[in-house]
Structures are given as C-alpha cells and as structure tokens.
Amino acid sequence: MAVIKMKPTSPGQRGAVKISRDHLFKGAPHAPLLEPQFQKAGRNNNGHITIRHRGGGAKHHYRVVDFVRNKDGIPAKVERIEYDPNRTAHIALVCYADGERRYIIAPRGLEAGATLLSGSEAPIRAGNTLPIRNIPVGSTIHCIELQPGKGAQIARSAGTSATLLAREGVYAQVRMRSGEVRRIHIECRATIGEVANEEHSLRQLGKAGVKRHMGIRPTVRGVVMNPVDHPHGGGEGKTGEGRHPVDPWGNLTKGYRTRNNKRTQVFIVSRRKK
C-alpha cells in the first residue's frame, strides 16, 4: 500500500494526500451481502436534529460484515480484499468450505488465497479467530468481543489493535491503543493481528468538498454567532468566548468527561492517557 501525494494543480489538490487502492478488488461487491442504507441527515423519527452537521453525501450500500466469526472448524478461503465506503478498514470476502460467503474485517498482511479458521483449535495466525483463553499472552489482537457471542466491538478501525497482557481467572487484561486497560471475559473472541489499511491516518482530504461527499456538513463556531444562538455569541468586533468553552446548550466541552456507566466501570483497570 502506498501514499499518493497529489500535484499542486489546484488549491484543493495542493494539500491532498490519498491512499492507493491498487491492491483492492476493482469489481462490484458481493450482492447477497449488501443491504440498503438510508440517509437520516442527523434527524430522529420526529424530524428533529439530534446530531448536528450531518446531511448529503454519496449513497452507499451497507456491506454486511461478520463480526461473530462462529463457523468453527470450517476452513474459509479468502477470495478478495475490497474497499468498504462505510468504514476505514478494508474488508475481505471469504468462502467457507460449505459454500457460504461472508465479509470480515481484513487484517494486515492478508491476501487472496489465504485460508482462515475460527474456533478454539485454530492456529495462531493473522486473521484466525479464537476465544481469548486460547490466545497466547502478549499477542496482538483486533475485533474483540465485550460479551461472549455478541460480536466484535473493539479495535475494528483501520490500523487498530490491542495487546493481550494477562489472564486472571475468567478475565483477561487487554491494553488498547489509547492506553486503556480493560478486563474482558476469556470466552470472548478476538482475531489475531491488527486491522489493515494502517496508512489511513496519513490521509489528507485537501478540500471541503471531500467532507461533503462523506455526508458531513460545515461546523459554525459559536463565537461568530449571535447571543440568541450560542453562549459564545455576541460582542462588538472579534471577541473570544468570555467564559469556559461550552456547547450551544451550555454544557462544558473541550475535555469535560461525560462517561457515566457504572455498570461497566468495574471492567476498566486503568483509564486512557489524556
């Protein structure tokens, strides 16, 4: 995979940095694994805006990705690596020995023709999925479940991974890329290796139009609004906030922690580094 620096033929091209997709499949996705995806534009069922700065963007079909990996003992052959417009990671189309095809998150180094396996007897090889109790301590893992059988919820983005630190009783300690250490049940499954497309962090959009294609609308600063529209608004000429930064509804922002989930607090051994 290569990084493409665009020639400065226009202001939008000047700062753009793209990621090469030459190694990805060029054809259409596997139709039985596609679902329609409708734009909500940040509105709820009443038509009220619940998420600001959403709307427009290119239409995409949703690719149904297998996050459970529960076909134990059945080898799967990787047919191709594909681009997925709905996520930063690439996806791989695998065909099981019984003929079923599924999409999975593509780990780094996976190529067409490779054979993957799931279950407690699977070898320790990139792309194989095992219960955490069967994974050696110190291994790099991704697509980690938080509850057994629920499907992967952690380390699914491009270039992400976690490290298995230790096992104590029925729980294991896993360190995330953020530095946070969590306790996860040893019956939860994880996939060996790290997620592919690690160069995604080097991408530079270059112009606002790319953001619009992604369905993200402009963000207006509160200090340029009127007092009726934002707590930071008003004043003669160019002024600052005049107070601690808040959102349009007066809630503290810029670093104010809002997490309040006592039910899962006990599973966090150490918080991420700020």
Curated annotation (Swiss-Prot):
UniProt feature, compositional bias: Basic and acidic residues: 229-246
Superkingdom of the source species: Bacteria
Alphabetic keyword roster: Ribonucleoprotein, Ribosomal protein, RNA-binding, rRNA-binding
GO BP: any one term: cytoplasmic translation
Region (Disordered) location: 223-256
One GO MF term: structural constituent of ribosome
GO CC term (a single one): large ribosomal subunit
A Pfam family: Ribosomal_L2_C
NCBIfam families hit by this protein: rplB_bact (TIGR01171)
The protein's assembly and partners: Part of the 50S ribosomal subunit. Forms a bridge to the 30S subunit in the 70S ribosome.
Annotated function: One of the primary rRNA binding proteins. Required for association of the 30S and 50S subunits to form the 70S ribosome, for tRNA binding and peptide bond formation. It has been suggested to have peptidyltransferase activity; this is somewhat controversial. Makes several contacts with the 16S rRNA in the 70S ribosome.
Family statement drawn from the similarity comment of this UniProt entry: Belongs to the universal ribosomal protein uL2 family.
PANTHER family in alphabetical order: LARGE RIBOSOMAL SUBUNIT PROTEIN UL2M, RIBOSOMAL PROTEIN L2
Protein name: Large ribosomal subunit protein uL2
Organism for this UniProt entry: Variovorax paradoxus (strain S110)
Lineage: Bacteria, Pseudomonadati, Pseudomonadota, Betaproteobacteria, Burkholderiales
